[in-house]
Curated annotation (Swiss-Prot):
GO terms for cellular component: chromosome; cytoplasm. It is found in: Cytoplasm. Its cofactor is Mg(2+); Mn(2+); Ca(2+). HAMAP family: GyrB (MF_01898). It catalyses: ATP-dependent breakage, passage and rejoining of double-stranded DNA. This is DNA gyrase subunit B. The keyword Lyase does not apply. The gene is gyrB. The lineage of its organism: Bacteria, Bacillati, Bacillota, Clostridia, Eubacteriales. Belongs to the type II topoisomerase GyrB family. Its EC number is 5.6.2.2. GO terms for molecular function: ATP binding; DNA binding; DNA negative supercoiling activity; metal ion binding.
Amino acid sequence: MSEKNEIYDESQIQVLEGLEAVRKRPGMYIGSTGTRGLHHLVYEIVDNSIDEALAGYCSHIKVFIHKDNSVTVSDDGRGMPIGIHHKMKKPTVEVIMTILHAGGKFGGGAYRVSGGLHGVGASVVNALSETCEVEVKTEGHIWKQTYHRGKVASPFEKIGDSDEHGTKIYFKPDPEIFEDTEYDYDTLSQRLRELAFLNKGIKIELTDERHDKNEIFHYEGGLKSFVSYLNRNKEVVFKEPIYVEGSIDSNYSVEIALQYNDGYNENIFSFANNIHTIEGGTHLAGFKTALTRVINDYAKKFGYLKENDKNLSGEDIREGLTAVVSVKLTEPQFEGQTKTKLGNTEVRGIVDSIISERVSTYLEENPQIGKLVIDKALVASRAREAAKKAREITRRKSVLESTSLPGKLADCSSKDAEECEIYIVEGDSAGGSAKQGRNRRFQAILPLRGKIMNVEKQRIDKILNSEEIKAMATAFGGGIGKDFDVSKLRYHKIIIMTDADVDGAHIRTLILTFFYRYMTELISEGHVFIAQPPLYKVTKTRKEYYAYSDKELEDVLQDVGGKDKNTDIQRYKGLGEMNPEQLWETTMNPEQRTLIKVNIEDAMAADEIFTILMGDKVDPRRKFIEENATKVVNLDV
C-alpha cells in the first residue's frame, strides 16, 4: 500500500464534468445545507490532505477555525500541481478548484488509495463558499489564487519564495447556501481524532481562534490507541487490545484492533479508506464470520467446548466487544449515495483469511487471554438461552392479537402507523391527564411506573423480565435487540414526556439508553422525540400565557407590561399539575407543541455518553457533569 508515484503533476488530473449544478443542488454533493453539510466542507479538504498522507507525502495537517467561522486547512504534502492543464489549458490549481470531478483520484495515477467523497472535494467547497483562497508551496515558490462563490476572482500567480512544500486552503462558507455557518468544535475534533487514529503517525492539529482552544491528535498506536480510547470509561477484560494487520499486494490492506470490556453491548466500528461505513459491508461481515469461527475452533481445541457441545454464537462471542475494522483498497465500491456500506465482494474473503490466521496465532501465543475471551462468551451463551423465553413475549403481536398489548396502554383507534404516535409518560397522574387530553384517533398513552431499569448494567435476560421494558417493547410492536424490525412499528412517533425536573431527566435518560442499546433504529430512523411541556404559566387579567424557558418567561412578562400584583406566575413541577386541556394545548397538540427530535449524529459519541452517565465508573461521570453543568438550562434543587 505504500507504493509511491513520485510525480504528481498536471498530467494526473482528469476532468469529468462542470461545476454549475453544485450551488443549485448542494445537498447532492454534501448531504445537506444544515450543520452536517457545513462540517462536511472541512472534511472534504482534510480528506485531500489525508490522501497525501496515505500516499506517503504528508505528516502534519493543520485546521484553523477563525473568529468569523471561516476555516483554513494546511498540509505539508507535495502541494497541488501548478502547471498548465494539458486539456483545459488553464492552471491546474484552477481546474481542481473550479471544475467538478477534477482530481488525482481518478485513473489511479496520483493516489493508490483515496478517501475523498468521489473526488469532488475542493471544487464543491469552493462553489459553496463566499470566499476561497488557495496557496501552494512547491518548487521553491508560493502560488496563490482567490475565488468568489466558485468563480475565479484573481489570477493564479506567484507571490513569493519558500523552501517549504504543501497546500493551504482558506474558505468562508456562503450564508446564502447554509442555514447556519457556525462550526461546532466538538464535531470537528471528533472526526479529526478519528482520522489520526486511523492513520497512525499522522499529526492533525485543530485550533479554534473563537475560543482560544488547541488540540493535537497524534497516535503512534493507531487502531490499538483507538480501541483503548473507546474503552477508556469501561472496565476492560484484558489490558492491551489485540491488534492484527495484513495486506494483499498493494491493492488491499486490513487493520483490526479489538478488546473486551465487562459490559454487554458490542461496539464494532468499521472504516473503508477512512470513511466510517455506518451500515457496515463486506469487511465487517468477513470480520464477524472469522472471529466466530476462530473462537469456536480455539474453544474446541483447548477443551472449553466438548465435541458434542453447540457452538458459541456470534452474538455470544461479541458480547462486550469493542473493535475497529479498517480496510484500505484501491477501488472501493460503496453502496448507495450515502457511501456508508462497503460492497466489494472480494474484501470479505480477504478480511476473513487475515483474521483467521492472525487472531488464531495470537490466542495460541496468549492462552490467558484466550481463556478470558472464552469464559466471557460462555457466560453470555447461558444468559442468551435464559433470554430466549422472555424474548418471545416481546415479539410483535398482530392486530388480531391486540389483547396481548399491555393493560395500561391507552391505544389509539387508527391502525395507520405513519400517523400514530405514542406518548411514554411517567406516573399515573400525568398518564391520566394525558389520556383525557389526547386525540384518541392517533395518540396512544403508555404510563410507566417509576424509573425503568438501567439497561447499561444488565444482561438481556434480566432486561426482558422488566415489566416496564416489556410494556414498551410490546406496545411499539417492533421486537427488541437483534430481533428488532423498525418496519413493524405500530407508531411512527415515540414521544417521551417526562416532568421538567431532575427525576424527569433521569427517567428520560434511562429510556433513551434502552432505545439506543436495544432498538437503535428507532433513533437512527427518526422515530424518537422529546416532548417540551411548559415551565411556567403566566396569568394576567384573566389571560393565560405559557413559557417554555426562563428567557421566554422574561419575554412574556415584558409583553404583558411587566410583573405587578395582577400577575400570577405558576412554575410547573410536574405534568400532573396541568389539567387535560392545558396538557393538550401546550404539549400534545400537533398544531402548537414543540418536539425535539433525537438523532445519532455520531454513534461513538453516543456510546461514550451513555457509558459515562449510566455505567459503573464514578470519576468519568463526575468529570462529565462538572464539564457540562454550565450547559444545564433548568435544574430543580
